[in-house]
Curated annotation (Swiss-Prot):
Compositionally biased spans, kind Polar residues: 141-157
GO cellular component, as recorded: extracellular region
S-S bonds: 27-55, 35-49, 39-56
Signal sequence annotation: 1-20
Pfam family, one: Defensin_beta_2
Species of the source: Pongo pygmaeus
Record Gene3D superfamilies: Antimicrobial Peptide, Beta-defensin 2, Chain A
Stretches for region Disordered: 109-157
Transmembrane segments: none
Stated name of the protein: Beta-defensin 125
Any single GO BP term: defense response to Gram-negative bacterium
Free-text function comment from the UniProt entry: Has antibacterial activity.
InterPro entries documented for this protein: Beta-defensin (IPR050544), Beta_defensin_dom (IPR025933)
Length: 157
């Protein structure tokens, strides 16, 4: 009787082992791919499975797998805007400025003011610096008073 029970247990385990080893392994998300040595012509390689096998996913769309639902269609006629809170916005960050007139401050000469449309002449600022520049006398630094550059980064004075 014990021998008979042992053979039933072994046969039951053998069917489980053979079922897992002879069936092609599944891979990828929701087990839609198959692990193979070479992908078929209608399949695409995605990643590597165990034992140097490739995870091959079919290029042809199969309806047996659940797919992501399509995006809902938005009709432009259904979109409405409420303009009741919008004042007369000119596009300028500061209110009541006219964006059609720009002022160039880098050029000197004749500019037109937008209010009167009359030309005005402006002159560049006069140069107040002299041609001679004097430098204060600098102290001569010796190697005894100043440490080398590698040491100056380490000292905190």
């Amino acid at each position: 009787m014990n021998l008979l029970m042992l053979t039933f247990i072994i046969c039951g385990l053998l069917t489980q082992v053979t079922k897992g080893s002879f069936e092609p392994q599944k891979c990828w998300k929701n087990n839609i791919g198959h692990c193979r040595r070479r992908c078929l012509d209608t399949e695409r390689y995605i990643l590597l499975c165990r034992n140097k096998l490739s995870c091959c996913i079919s290029i042809i769309i199969s309806h047996e797998y659940t797919r992501r639902p399509a995006f809902p269609v938005i009709h432009l006629e259904d979109i409405t805007f409420d303009y009741s809170d919008v004042d007369s916005f000119t596009g300028s960050p500061v209110s009541m400025l006219n964006d059609l007139i720009t002022f160039d401050t880098t050029k000197f000469g004749e500019t037109i003011t937008p209010e009167t449309n009359t030309p005005e002449t402006t002159m560049p600022p006069s140069e107040t610096t002299s041609s001679k520049t004097t430098m204060p006398p600098s102290e001569t630094a010796t190697s005894e008073t100043m440490p080398p550059p590698s040491q100056t980064a380490l000292t905190h004075n």
